[in-house]
């Protein structure tokens, strides 16, 4: 099929499987939605591996149920027939004069080729798709890219390539550092790709064909018209989960999947989620800070990974942004604050506040020292030399502030400095920033994936403690991950550990706590047991660190010791925001 099938449905002109030829001859397929009749429309484009024909409701039942409960307005003013995972609804955008282009990425859905997610080839393809969309008869020549997660992450990469028709980027919950945020947290292998790739990507690889799902709209297979043997599919699918397991240190493989942010020039909106512990949160902040764009905005919200992308709040924000840059309309965006934060309180309360920068200029960086006597957390450093040990497969050590006498806002990046020794030649350190209510119970928050997440998480493999002095900040250490420095059993080493950006207003009577442990955080050992959930949710969702080859029990299932001396007092550096 060399041309698209065109039809008018639900007051939209739809071109199914429009061909987009790449420079190597591979033809990618896109579904195009635009207003009926002649005209030149601004374009909202996406490129990704989730199959443009797979309905959100069928492919992601648990997430759809959570979305429509949290944001019931999603069901209004739309038949929802064209809903696709992590992309905008055509029935809500085309009536506003936008054209939507959904491209199946190379090797996925209806596009043939080798499936190699986040590769340099994908960025080149996305560049070509932007240029194709910007030169069609129905296009006004201005192309914006929009989408959550995968559809956000690849925007950093193509933005750095500067396609001429690229006019705006909306990077909604999109990681920006392939090694540090997706594959290896603090050098520790994250198991996410092992569950994500077969479930969400390989299941719709081009050539799955009749073995896979069918479009609820067209009745056609969402993973291509041909059905290939599984052996053939394997030949055309990169070993995405296996590469990070084999590559313990940062190398060219990871570098090729991480953008040169200084090259990005297009206006961009980076939308982060306070609850994105384990994948995207850090990337939205770091990418925004590093991007070369003169016109860039940061927005931060809460709730699930998808709620506010589809809610009236998020849709309005996106349309104001794209209306300004793609249509040239006066949407009020010229008055949009460069930083817009939804400040988080317990019980899922958020209060919007406008700011000028990140981290906030008025931050009082405050050291909260870990105290071995009673395992307290406070402003006074301990003076006596001592040590506390913990079993790495146990609950670890928890240090708590006294109940607060007045509210305390923590908004920004967090870091800890510890002196740790191990019985072996290495140690994996898991940090959990927690909120404890007056009854002594953990206060958790709806996270992007898991409905019960803590205030913040941080990780570091002790052998990866080498810092880059040029990139490190007291509040955000930057580890090179290019060398392994083994420990000498029993000998303490200094560790600077990053806890990803967070926000919480701690009410009077509550406590802040820091837990140091040797394995993933769990709320109480139970599963949240969401209907149709694709994985257990015990506090960190799919972002587990349990690979026995990466975390050899002979090394990591042991005993660690936290050391205290007068001149080496471990502390937590908190971004305290003064009242008023």
Name every feature range the model reports, one short phrase each.
Residues 53-57, 61-79, 83-90, 95, ...:
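Accessory cap/linker subdomain of secreted extracellular hydrolases
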Residues 137-150:
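Alpha/beta-hydrolase fold nucleophile elbow
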Residues 264, 270-272:
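Short beta-strand/loop motif that positions the catalytic acidic residue
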Residues 152-163, 418:
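Short glycine-enriched nucleophile-adjacent loop
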Residues 90, 94-110:
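Conserved alpha/beta-hydrolase
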Residues 84-85, 95, 117-137:
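Alpha/beta-hydrolase active-site loop
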Residues 2-39, 43, 400-406, 419-420, ...:
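N-terminal cap/lid segment of alpha/beta-hydrolase-fold proteins
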Residues 77, 314-316, 326-580:
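Glycine/threonine-rich phosphate-binding loop and adjacent beta-strand/alpha-helix elements that clamp
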